């Protein structure tokens, strides 16, 4: 339990920040799912355009340190490889 005024304020800020980070993580998951759905549809050009639109979301969330930059790079690499594997 936060006893000092400073600790109470930091606790309030942590709650708000946690909610904000959760919304950003949700946006990341949605962007990744959109790309996967486009890949599973089998249309390479559509999948590539969806990838190009959503890769900035992945990068932005990594820049804000919501996820590690290597995790963002791993997602982008695997999704890009899946698109390239389409015939």
Swiss-Prot record:
SS bond list: none
Gene Ontology biological process terms in this record: translation
Against Pfam families, the record matches this protein to: Ribosomal_S20p
Q: Which SUPFAM superfamilies match?
A: Ribosomal protein S20
* Keyword annotations: Ribonucleoprotein, Ribosomal protein, RNA-binding, rRNA-binding
**Is Nucleotidyltransferase set as a keyword in this record?**
no
Transmembrane ranges, per UniProt, are: none
Q: Does the keyword Ribonucleoprotein apply?
A: yes
Write out the GO MF terms.
small ribosomal subunit rRNA binding; structural constituent of ribosome
Q: For the region Disordered, give the residue spans.
A: 1-22
List compositional bias (Basic residues) regions by residue number. Answer: 7-19
Check the record and name the InterPro entries matching this protein.
Ribosomal_bS20, Ribosomal_bS20_sf
Its Gene Ontology cellular component terms are:
cytosol; small ribosomal subunit
According to its UniProt entry, the function of this protein is described as: Binds directly to 16S ribosomal RNA.
Family to which this protein belongs: Belongs to the bacterial ribosomal protein bS20 family.
- What is the official name of this protein in its record? Small ribosomal subunit protein bS20
Native species: Methylobacillus flagellatus (strain ATCC 51484 / DSM 6875 / VKM B-1610 / KT)
